[in-house]
Amino acid sequence: MKWDAIMVALRGKRLAVLGARGVGKTHLVKFLATGSIPAEYKQTVAPEKSASRRFQLHDLDLKVKSSLDVSGDKAAYGEWKQLHDQADVIFYLLRADRLIAGDHKVESRVRDDLKHIGGWLQTSVSRPRFFIIGTHCDLDANFVRTPADNFGDYVDRFRALPIVTELVSRGGGAQQVNVVLGSMKSHQDTEALVYQIFRQVVS
């Protein structure tokens, strides 16, 4: 991965992290402020012993703002709208494991969220980059069983879920919406997730 390209794409950018309570916003924000990612990420059973080159995320000088949880009351989306309007990049986090399990309550919540976000994106003069980030995949048995070289198939199956197809459509379609899946259960899992996100930022 080319760190120089990431620096050009993201340095000093304003980043909004949106999502309901319990999706991992605080964890991701903290990692983006203090963590680091390897120059090259290989999924391994055991941590790599070799001291490979690492990139310190604070070097990006990201201006990260995280949303508070909002209730179902539409008036509570005002804070999200403010964050959206000030952002160059938006990360919308959701519980991928619950959508895979067909949790209707979570489906209803993310549908409401994307109705709002999608409307803001459509009317935005300078459209921010938009990412749907599915977290808690470690709680899905199929994710745990999926070998690294078949991970693309896992993502494709997730994107094919009717609710995800709807969310992507509301966000502006497949050309405008990046979908990234992973886990933040461990430090290494979080590194892998952020690595995937950054790869899509510069692709």
Region spans (language model):
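Short, flexible boundary segments at extreme N-termini or domain junctions of P-loop NTPases and their
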Residues: 1-17
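ATP-binding Walker
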Residues: 23
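Walker A/P-loop
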Residues: 26
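Switch I (effector-binding) loop of TRAFAC-class P-loop GTPase G-domains
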Residues: 33-65, 75
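Inter-motif core of Ras-like GTPase G domains
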Residues: 77-103, 116-120
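Conserved beta-strand/loop subsegment of P-loop NTPase cores
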Residues: 89-92, 121-138, 170-181
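Amphipathic helical hotspot of TIR/SEFIR-family domains
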Residues: 102-130
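Canonical P-loop GTPase G-domain recognition
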Residues: 140-203
